[in-house]
UniProtKB/Swiss-Prot annotation:
Pfam families xref list: SelR
Keywords tagged on the record: Metal-binding, Oxidoreductase, Zinc
Name of the protein described by the UniProt record: Peptide methionine sulfoxide reductase MsrB
Organism domain of life: Bacteria
Matching PROSITE patterns: MSRB
Catalytic activity, as annotated: L-methionyl-[protein] + [thioredoxin]-disulfide + H2O = L-methionyl-(R)-S-oxide-[protein] + [thioredoxin]-dithiol
EC number: 1.8.4.12
InterPro entries (UniProt xref): Met_Sox_Rdtase_MsrB, Met_Sox_Rdtase_MsrB_dom, Mss4-like_sf
Protein family per UniProt: Belongs to the MsrB Met sulfoxide reductase family.
Entry annotation: catalytic residues: C128 (nucleophile)
Cellular component GO terms, alphabetical: cytoplasm
């Protein structure tokens, strides 16, 4: 993990026992211990359906399908969140790298990382997000 989860207080209260009951082991490890799914294994990596991606822990709407694109990195990629206020960014110096960790701003769940190698005609950002941190709500009427 990139830092102490208690250095910021998030509005959504979390109960560890309840999270362990409700989340899969992978969802728990990703969101609570900043684990990472293996590339190209996540449920939403190739999803192209219209809809909204929510935080698996608290349900906050995080990304819209219109901002999703195929980056080839092996994880779902978005060029922007649904709103800047839903994301918390924190420097991550783990694994001998310097990266920017992305968390849900409501509950502090680890989502993934953001990089500056996204589509230049959009934001230039690539939000590289673990499928295990997300729930997808289909919106077929958006197509």
């Amino acid at each position: 993990m990139s830092g102490d989860r208690d250095d910021k207080r998030y509005p959504y209260p979390k109960d560890d026992a309840e999270l362990r009951r409700r989340l899969t082991p992978m969802q728990y490890e990703v969101t609570q211990h900043a684990a990472t799914e293996r590339p190209f294994t996540g449920e939403y990596t190739d999803t192209e359906d219209a809809g909204i991606y929510h935080c698996v822990v608290c349900g906050t709407a995080l990304f819209e399908s219109g901002a999703k694109y195929h980056s080839g990195c092996g994880w779902p990629s978005y060029f922007k969140p649904i709103d800047a206020e839903v994301i918390d960014e924190k420097m991550d110096y783990t694994h001998g790298m310097t990266r920017v960790e992305v968390r849900c701003n409501q509950c502090g769940a680890h989502l993934g990382h953001v990089f500056e190698d996204g589509p230049r005609d959009k934001t230039g950002l690539r939000y590289c997000i673990n499928s295990a941190a997300l729930n997808f709500e289909a919106k077929p009427e958006w197509k």
